[in-house]
Amino acid sequence: MAPSKQADFLRALYQDWTDRMVADPNLSIANLRSMFDEWGQPALEPENVCYKSDRLGGVEAIWALPVGADNSRAIVYTHGGGFAVGSADSHRKLAGHLAKALNVTAVVLHYRRAPEHPFPAQIEDAVAAYKALLEKGFDATKLSTAGDSAGGNLAIASALKMRDLRLPLPGSVIAFSPWLDMALRGATLETNSTTDALVGRGILEAMAGMFLGSKTVPRDPLANPLENDFKGFPPLYLNAGGDETLLSDSETLHAKAKAQGVKTVLSVVPGMQHVFPALSGRAPEADEELGRIAAWYESLCFGHTHRQLRCGTNPTRS
């Protein structure tokens, strides 16, 4: 099935960003951040979701609070943007839609960004916020980490760091189009290079350089979760668009995690761009994907789901 007309909004936005970066390859980090703050445009404002600023473990954050949600459950959400751009504000609507779909709360972290703060500052901030929630009395099994693109990496890497620190692990991890391999070895970097409107090898190399800095190698097992061990990792939901260059990262992690005993789901929706759930409230493909995640979450937490899902996008799942 061809992508919906509404899904073209994201492709057009990404193409506009790409054109602007090609026209001015020396855009300052400040101008890049200003441009990528437009990431908040694709998602429509979720109905009956309130927002509140907070500070958790020293990290600035925005709570997304759906009316009637289970306040004992929360998502720690890390935004995308190559570890260097994007913000809690640019991603609050996406987090709000996810929280509403799961009937939980979400807290979107404005973690320290590269290049001013290279690895591992971002992971340190995510873990600090998570620990603050534990100190507030949250049950770890009722917490989830989630994120998109580079933030999907952080959602996964922060859980790995929690395991290393022997902290109670979150009950689940959700990653939209995670960028995992700082060594850039994925086959779809080449095979999907003409269908992905935003993410190519050049932009990834630049972002990886800012994130890793001068002291971290591309195959460091926390900066690059594909190099890590996933034994004992929480249940994992991976989502990707069929047209994106980072698809291989999700496929590789899914296979590795599954082989090591992780309860993992990979949902790939054909014809979709990078982080297409950013279209939540606008495009049916995004809303249907959130419905599938919600059904998975309900089954995971409660052993059943009452949801009736439309799967017109025909995702491939494994």
Annotate each language-model stretch with its function.
Residues 217-235:
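The feature captures the conserved acid-bearing segment of alpha/beta-hydrolase catalytic domains
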Residues 160-218, 232:
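Hydrolase active-site cap/lid region
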Residues 1-69, 217, 298, 302-318:
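A glycine/proline-hinged amphipathic helix-loop "lid/cap" segment
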Residues 147, 151, 155:
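Gly/Ala-rich beta-loop-alpha elbow adjacent to hydrolase catalytic centers
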Residues 238-240:
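Short beta-strand/loop motif that positions the catalytic acidic residue
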Residues 87-88, 94, 107-142, 280-286:
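Catalytic nucleophile-loop/oxyanion-hole region of alpha/beta-hydrolase
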Residues 72-81:
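Short beta-strand element of the alpha/beta-hydrolase
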Residues 252, 258-315:
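C-terminal catalytic histidine-bearing segment of alpha/beta-hydrolase fold enzymes
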